[in-house]
């Protein structure tokens, strides 16, 4: 009985904490107090990149949860709403997001848009050579994606251009050390 009470007490504390920390069902772009532009990204990978470069100057909104397969992910109506309400949409490109490509191309910017065909690797898929969308395995391509992301963020929040440029320079230096 004591174990059950302890369990229920811990569960109650966790639920209270989650309720206190959560927002009212996602971001509210019409909120008067909401000053940061919203950057919607497709993956946790890009979410981390935007955080490194822009920090708290933007609000990040993630579409595909960590652990989900982006190649197979099917957008929900809430995802489409995120795309519509975003001030900037960033996605991998190279058909990484599979079934969401059409919606993303209409509204977003692929961080891989500056990649040349000769730089992009290929992989075998069902006996065919196809573009390998996993650019982060190539540090030079990843750095190009960081620069593209930085450019887009500086255009979005021009008052913070110098901080984003500084963060980009530091992040690229960290990548050079890898």
Give the positions of each predicted feature.
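Positively charged n-region of N-terminal signal peptides that target proteins for export
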Residues: 1-7
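Extracytoplasmic metal-acquisition and chelation regions
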Residues: 7-9, 17-178
